[in-house]
A protein has these predicted regions:
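Glycan-processing catalytic domains of CAZymes
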Residues: 1-298
Length: 298
């Protein structure tokens, strides 16, 4: 069963209404865990997840997930950081990941059907000049291939009136031919690990699921270590916070100065995972007790 976009819905709808709120981040984690343990129990505990924020580590830790991925573009965060977290979680817990690109944005969706209305700034209206640009869709599907995704694709709009391929469908068809011709691009090289504290609950400063900016766990304000995490990610992916807020599509794939070199891990990552990375960057204030394991990397 699919746990689809539920981390975003938890953060945006459930966490702000929680009572008592609780100011302790460890307690916030247990609140999150109880919520999704109940969901897993109801869905049979054989799950896949399409994350809408960056909480995939917490899902995969439970050992009941077989696949993890994210929907990119749309009104959603930067794809590069999405997959930094997804790769880190997948490598730690031995779960494959997939790629998905959306034809929607905050102002509508791309459609080439003859009955497409094409109303400006209407989220429920589709048209050939609306939604995610073809350029961004193409860049996303090929970067997902380079990110070692086991499957990639678009969410829809791949046909015109169910009669022939749309330009979106042709992009996917070309990607299939590219893979057939050149094969597996190989293992992506990510020499840097960015580590956050397991209980931090850090997420993107602003996002689709809440109008409240700079929150952790969906209900607590950023503190100094959270701004450090944001700042470190902005060094690697400058302007990533802008994703989805501008019609010029800035922020979804940033012109990063160092390439996509990083995976994001949490402080519970075992030593055998940490040793896969030549460089470890502590991008958060860690709970005490991590020192011995980190020093063992020397």
């Amino acid at each position: 069963m699919d746990n689809g976009e539920q981390d975003g819905r938890y953060v945006g709808s459930f966490a702000p209404r929680m009572y008592p709120l609780g100011a302790d981040r460890k307690q916030q984690y247990f609140n999150f865990q109880r919520h999704f343990q109940e969901m897993g129990d109801q869905l049979g505990n054989k799950m896949a997840t399409l994350v809408s924020l960056n909480f995939g580590h917490y899902f995969l830790k439970e050992g009941v997930y077989t696949l993890i991925g994210a929907e990119t573009a749309q009104g959603l965060p930067n794809s590069q950081i999405y997959y930094s977290f997804i790769r880190g979680a997948g490598k730690q817990y031995g779960v494959n990941w997939f790629g998905n690109a959306s034809v929607w944005n905050r102002w509508g969706w791309k459609s080439y059907d003859s009955n497409a209305e094409g109303i400006d700034n209407d989220y429920n209206s589709g048209g050939p000049l609306k939604g995610t640009s073809l350029g961004l869709l193409k860049r996303l599907i090929y970067t997902h291939l380079m990110y070692d995704c086991v499957a990639v694709g678009f969410e829809g709009s791949m046909r015109i009136d169910d009669k022939k391929l749309s330009p979106i469908g042709k992009i996917q068809q070309s990607a299939v031919k590219w893979v057939d011709k050149y094969g597996d691009p190989g293992v992506m090289y990510t020499p840097v690990a960015l580590m956050t504290d397991f209980f931090s609950g850090w997420s993107f400063p602003r996002h689709l699921y809440s109008r409240q900016a700079y929150k952790v766990w969906g209900n607590l304000p950023y503190e100094l270590p959270d701004y450090l995490t944001d700042g470190m990610l902005d060094v690697l992916y400058p302007g990533y916070q802008d994703a989805s807020y501008y019609k010029d599509e800035r922020g979804f794939i940033t012109p990063n100065p160092y390439g996509d070199i990083a995976d994001c891990l949490m402080s519970d990552a075992p030593l055998w995972v940490l040793k896969q990375y030549p460089v470890l960057v502590i991008a958060d204030e860690l709970h005490p007790g991590q020192e011995q394991r980190i020093r063992a990397l020397r």
